[in-house]
Design a protein with these regions (language model features):
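Conserved phosphotransfer microenvironments
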Residues: 42-43, 53-74
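C-terminal output helix
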Residues: 111-119
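Conserved acidic segment of CheY-like receiver
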Residues: 2-26, 35, 55-56
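A short, hydrophobic beta-strand element within the central beta-sheet of small alpha/beta folds
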Residues: 80-90
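The C-terminal output helix
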Residues: 121-127
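Alpha4-beta5-alpha5 "output face"
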Residues: 75, 96-100
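Short hydrophobic/Thr-rich beta-strand motif most characteristic of the beta2 strand and flanking loop
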Residues: 31-39
């Protein structure tokens, strides 16, 4: 992952607007590819095909149990994978669920691009 321009990041987001925000924030570092609707098998297959080391998983109150299970399952299958949760930064329960599931960090939707890019740079150095 020394060539940051060739990085591919996977994302499971609430909607296309969130995906576009993430793509814009990470455009200087690589490309963000949608990982579909949240199927573990689909996510793991995409990780294998794209060699992505970092996955963004959107969390919301309605689906937090399934989304947390997805994070846990992905990390169980791919322990070296880094997962960053996305969600409402004001919702402490989402943040707690993300951390308990094994996410490395939590990013609030709409955060400044520089914050997101800085986080990804730091995480990429550890991968």
């Amino acid at each position: 992952m020394s060539d940051s321009l060739s990085q591919t990041f996977l994302a499971i987001t609430r909607n296309s607007t969130d995906l576009e925000w993430l793509q814009g924030a990470l455009a200087p570092l690589g490309q963000v590819v949608s990982a579909g609707t949240g199927s573990l098998d689909e996510l793991l297959a995409l990780v294998d095909v794209t060699f992505a080391g970092l996955v963004f998983v959107g969390l919301d109150r309605e689906n937090v149990v399934a989304q947390s299970a997805l994070i846990e399952g992905a990390l169980e299958a791919k322990p070296m994978l880094a997962v960053v949760a996305l969600g409402d930064g004001m919702d402490n329960q989402l943040v707690l669920n993300a951390m308990r599931a094994g996410a490395r960090d939590f990013v609030a939707y709409g955060s400044r691009s520089s914050e997101v890019a800085g986080l990804v740079r730091r995480l990429s150095k550890r991968l």
